[in-house]
Amino acid sequence: MSLWLSRWTALHLTGGRVISTPQTEEERWLLSVVERLAKEWGYKTPQLAIYQSPQPNAFATGATRNRSLVAVSSGLLQMMNRDEVEGVIGHEMSHVGNGDMVTMALIQGVLNAFVYVIARAVGRLLSERLDLGALGYWVCFVVLQITFTLLASIVVLYYSRRREYAADAGSARHVGVDKMIAALQKLRHPISTEAPLPKAMNSFGIRESDEKTSIWATHPSIESRIAALRKMS
């Protein structure tokens, strides 16, 4: 259900404005890029939106490849030239083409179910062997669920970082390696301390609000992404 509401939710959280009828030359150009890349990928043209934020960022979301949304921030359009913006749009369109939103939701759902079942089973086993009673069982269950959830998060975040490399590569193949590298280089130094996206949407943006190089990061470092792209050229 959350996937089917994801476009509406994203627009609500960011205040994005859908560009159904372009009013400016910039909007016409943006829509033409999205339409061209959708045709190359072989899926229906996503909704295109612009949201107001001084931070350069963009995101993609949607329940399926043919029911998707690609949005860019006003800060990104002000900071980047057209080649760099095209690289960013190519990255987001790659997420749509690769079905990353659906895969992430499925992985999260399966792991959540796995964590619940295993935590209950192990909690019951421990409470019976140690004669902890009903209260002891629930304490074990809660502690185990928290522990297993943290471990499962490492798996989800690892996949999130891998999909960023894949989206970078997809953009490089469709719009050019140089454009994608140039876009990432611009993202090294955001122009505002404001978080690029609401915290709940960090994993959907092209960059994370707090650049980290750890197992808890949703995105790889900009440097490692650029290095991976340079290996393609």
Question: For each of these PLM feature ranges, what is it?
Answer:
Residues R7, V34, V72, G87-H95, ...:
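Active-site recognition of the HExxH zinc-binding catalytic motif
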Residues M79, V96-D100, L132-C140:
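Juxtamembrane/transmembrane-helix boundary motifs in multi-pass membrane proteins
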Residues R67-L69, V85:
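Conserved catalytic motifs of the protein kinase core domain
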Residues G42-R67, I154, Y158, S171-S233:
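Active-site-proximal gating segments in proteases and membrane effectors
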Residues W29, E84, A105, R162, ...:
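Alpha-helix N-cap and coil->helix boundary residues
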Residues M1-T61, Q108, N112-Y165, P190-A195, ...:
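Hydrophobic or amphipathic, alpha-helical segments that drive membrane association/targeting
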Residues M93-G109, M180:
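Catalytic Zn2+-binding segment of zinc metalloproteases
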Residues I19-P22, S74-G87:
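Short pre-active-site segment immediately N-terminal to the catalytic Zn-binding motif
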